[in-house]
Amino acid sequence: MLQPKRTKFRKMQKGRNRGLALRGNQVSFGEFGLKSTERGRLTARQIEAARRAMTRHIKRGGRIWIRVFPDKPITQKPLEVRQGKGKGSVEYWVAQIQPGKMLYEVEGVSEQLAREAFALAAAKLPLSTTFVTRTVM
């Protein structure tokens, strides 16, 4: 699963996830993309599950790009532990997603196959998404 190799600090504050995706909001690598229309966060497991669903449907066909990376650690205290005594240990990693963020891209497959693959991937994700096509200026 995806997670950073090294970080400057092990734990991070919760923070807020506001605004729209100003970067990574267009199809840059492939022909078709899966774009988020909702704000939230994706865990490394969810990103991997969606990738697997797409890869299995496309088979040997095209190429897939993952445009998000889980770089925020989420901590949890163990069950039945009283409050205090410091911050919990890192349990998993998430990518914070703003509306308009491109999640996945695909190239080398038909539009119909790309739509089917993205529908399978979207079913694994906790966000609402939309299918987009590359626009050449």
From Swiss-Prot:
GO cellular component, as recorded: cytosolic large ribosomal subunit
GO molecular function annotations of the record: rRNA binding; structural constituent of ribosome; tRNA binding
GO biological process: translation
Pfam families: Ribosomal_L16
Transmembrane region(s): none
Source superkingdom: Bacteria
Coiled coil: none
Family: Belongs to the universal ribosomal protein uL16 family.
Protein's name according to its UniProt entry: Large ribosomal subunit protein uL16
Protein source organism: Marinomonas sp. (strain MWYL1)
Gene: rplP
